[in-house]
């Protein structure tokens, strides 16, 4: 049946090409789109594929949304609107982006997804061929299509995330000749020099270094279960997330995970409007054009309403119920992130689809309820994770040197940091609040309230964080008490979720965000909207979910030496100064799980006033103040005594002074 629909679609597309002039002023669009879909159908039909052919397809496919060609691409809402008017222009840009998912379906051999994609386009094109087109009619068609196929789409997506039997990418990793960089074109993702050069570089490293990198990563994941007293014996699978080009490390990680009884689940980040999120989750590659992706962040605005949200949640629940056995044995994600991309400063376009206020509220509600569904089947207290990060060649000419330095940072002596960080914790446990103050142009002036402890001889507010789930080593952190947490957090420049924020300033009142601004755009309205969309995720406020002090001065020296401070991921940057997370605490949904520090004390600061009432936000974004922008951090006791921890960016608390030794290298 599917194959018949596929053949009929190809015939209909050829007919559309013949009759395209009947779509009148829209003929250029429909002609281009028909060519695009005929191209992916031809790729699907080509069963014997050489690497050279895959390479050629890849370059042709991604070329037309490249930065060089995007100005005149139908994927550009600005261009489409200029050519066809706002109502049709936005719809056409949306449809173009949705049809581009067809390349992945063709490469993977996913005929069902390819067929329904074709049918959506053909149904819309028929409106124009018959002269019955109207923006509202098109939106109805899109809504009905998304609703009708949500069950199938979400069932497959959840299966992708839980079933090792879906092994498209696993086979590429485990069976390909990794000495040939062209094997990367098998994925169907955009392949740039970053991916090619990363693989070439890793192929030059001795096998023992590759094994050591994989072991650091796998051991971190395994230790997460041990440290948090989670029984790993029922677990049978792990999700490996990475950037294409790291296959030698991933292959070794698969082998090491198998030794502890875990099979790999490797899936790509979502490619359709139903499966894409604001963040890419899965295996990824460099973006052919970050502005294109930014322009299409809220494409769901064209059909997302309360009816659809409820239906989507029902489909989500049904999919998890179908794969509940696979969910039960899922151990969690092991994430290998990358950094070093050229900074992306997005352009705000009036023509982009945007969520209405009502849709924003529904989106927040969906994220909350979808998270609750997932947590029913993959219980937070029964899973773990790990996350590690490496540079990519785009970071500059010193890539190989920086890579080796990052490997060193990722494998620093945990025992040394355990002892030093304990001195910080002992001082912080005496505090009722901690005062953090910036210097120079940094306007930070914050008082963070601490939870009361019943028995300080057996309890602690701060976790001694070593290199297990969160690599590299180097922080102590707590869940602040919201009441009494007040002041301003300011950073001159910071990268959060691949976006650059300039002069980010957030005011907290009783632990909740009360005001915010930045200087990314000309108008205050644009700046506030940028923060609300990309930091608050369309909420009106978020709590301060974490306060931490990073101790990894070695990483800081590396950043300064190679001038990459503002290219490093938050995973490393958070270890290089005090940081504050907005959103949930680090113990979200796991507050009742007993966690102890190496000294045996139980960590008791796990709830805050929001989570105590069952209120969660499904986000956690860390914001760090670099040492150089820091005047002081001071623990203030109940009696008003001040215990100085850091002064002028240097550690001054007794027992922590050795952390300053790396800083002498940069003066």
Predicted regions and their residues:
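Active-site bordering "gate/hinge" segments
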Residues: 1-483, 647, 651-667
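Generic beta-strand/beta-sheet core signal
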Residues: 241, 388, 437-439, 451, ...
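Short, glycine-/Ser/Thr-/acidic-enriched flexible segments
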Residues: 245, 341-343, 392, 441, ...
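Short solvent-exposed loop/turn micro-motifs enriched in small/polar/acidic residues
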Residues: 429, 497-500, 540, 573
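Long, well-ordered mid-to-C-terminal structural blocks that present hydrophobic/aromatic surfaces
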Residues: 479-538
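Active-site lining segments that contact anionic ligands and/or coordinate catalytic metals
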Residues: 484-486, 501-503, 510-513, 542-546, ...
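Dual-mode signal for accessory low-complexity, basic/Gly-rich regions
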Residues: 515-587, 591
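Extended hydrophobic packing segments that form well-structured cores
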Residues: 599-667
């Amino acid at each position: 049946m599917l194959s018949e629909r596929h053949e009929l679609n190809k015939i209909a597309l050829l007919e559309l090409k013949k009759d395209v002039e009947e779509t009148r002023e829209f003929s250029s669009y429909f002609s281009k789109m028909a060519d695009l879909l005929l191209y992916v159908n031809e790729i699907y039909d080509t069963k014997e594929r050489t690497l050279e052919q895959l390479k050629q397809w890849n370059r042709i496919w991604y070329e037309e949304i490249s930065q060089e060609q995007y100005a005149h691409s139908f994927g550009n809402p600005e261009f489409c609107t200029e050519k066809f008017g706002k109502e049709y222009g936005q719809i056409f840009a949306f449809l173009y982006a949705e049809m581009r998912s067809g390349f992945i379906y063709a490469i993977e051999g996913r005929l069902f997804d390819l067929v329904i994609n074709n049918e959506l386009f053909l149904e819309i094109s028929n409106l124009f061929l018959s002269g019955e087109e109207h923006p509202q009619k098109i939106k109805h068609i899109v809504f009905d299509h998304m609703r009708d196929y949500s069950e199938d789409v979400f069932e497959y997506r959840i299966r992708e995330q839980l079933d090792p039997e879906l092994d498209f990418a696993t086979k590429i990793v485990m069976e390909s000749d990794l000495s040939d960089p062209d094997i990367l074109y098998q994925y169907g993702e955009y392949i740039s020099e970053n991916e090619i050069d990363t693989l070439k570089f890793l192929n030059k490293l001795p096998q023992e270094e590759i094994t050591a990198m994989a072991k650091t990563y796998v051991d971190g994941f395994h230790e997460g279960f041990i440290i948090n007293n989670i029984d790993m014996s029922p677990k049978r699978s792990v999700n490996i997330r990475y950037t294409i080009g790291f296959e030698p490390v991933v292959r070794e990680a698969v082998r090491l995970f198998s030794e502890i009884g875990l099979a790999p689940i490797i899936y790509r980040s979502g490619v359709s409007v139903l499966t894409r999120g604001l963040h890419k989750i899965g295996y990824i590659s460099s973006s052919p054009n970050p502005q294109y992706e930014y322009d299409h962040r809220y494409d769901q605005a064209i059909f997302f309403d309360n009816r659809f949200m409820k239906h989507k949640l029902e489909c989500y629940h049904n999919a998890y119920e179908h794969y509940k056995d696979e969910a039960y044995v899922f151990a969690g994600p092991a994430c290998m992130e990358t950094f070093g991309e050229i900074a992306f400063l997005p352009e705000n376009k009036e023509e982009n689809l945007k969520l209405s206020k009502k849709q924003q509220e529904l989106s927040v509600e969906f994220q909350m309820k979808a998270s609750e569904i997932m947590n029913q089947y993959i219980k937070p207290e029964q899973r773990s994770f790990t996350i590690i990060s490496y540079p990519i060649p785009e970071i500059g000419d010193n890539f190989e040197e920086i890579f080796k330095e990052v490997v060193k940072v990722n494998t620093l002596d945990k025992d040394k940091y355990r002892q030093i960080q304990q001195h910080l914790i002992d001082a912080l446990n005496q505090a009722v609040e901690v005062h953090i103050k910036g210097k120079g142009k940094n306007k930070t002036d914050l008082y963070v309230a601490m939870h009361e402890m019943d028995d300080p001889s057996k309890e602690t507010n701060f976790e001694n964080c070593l290199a297990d789930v969160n690599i590299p080593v180097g922080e102590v952190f707590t869940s602040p008490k919201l009441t009494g947490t007040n002041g301003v957090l300011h950073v001159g420049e910071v990268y959060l979720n691949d976006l650059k924020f300039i002069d980010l300033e957030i005011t907290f009142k009783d632990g909740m965000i009360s005001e915010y601004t930045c200087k990314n755009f000309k108008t205050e309205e644009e700046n506030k909207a940028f923060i609300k969309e990309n930091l608050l995720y369309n909420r009106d406020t978020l709590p301060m979910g974490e306060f931490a002090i990073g101790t990894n001065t070695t990483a800081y020296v590396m950043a300064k030496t190679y001038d990459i401070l503002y290219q490093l991921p938050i995973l490393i940057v958070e270890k290089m100064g005090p940081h504050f997370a907005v959103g949930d605490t680090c113990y979200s949904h796991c507050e009742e799980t007993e966690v102890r520090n190496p000294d045996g004390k139980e960590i008791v600061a796990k709830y805050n006033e929001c989570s105590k009432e069952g209120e969660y936000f499904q986000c956690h974004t860390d914001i760090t103040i670099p040492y150089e922008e820091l005047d002081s951090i001071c623990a203030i006791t109940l009696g008003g005594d001040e215990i100085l921890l850091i002064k002028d960016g240097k550690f001054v608390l007794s027992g922590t002074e050795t952390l300053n030794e790396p800083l002498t290298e940069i003066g």
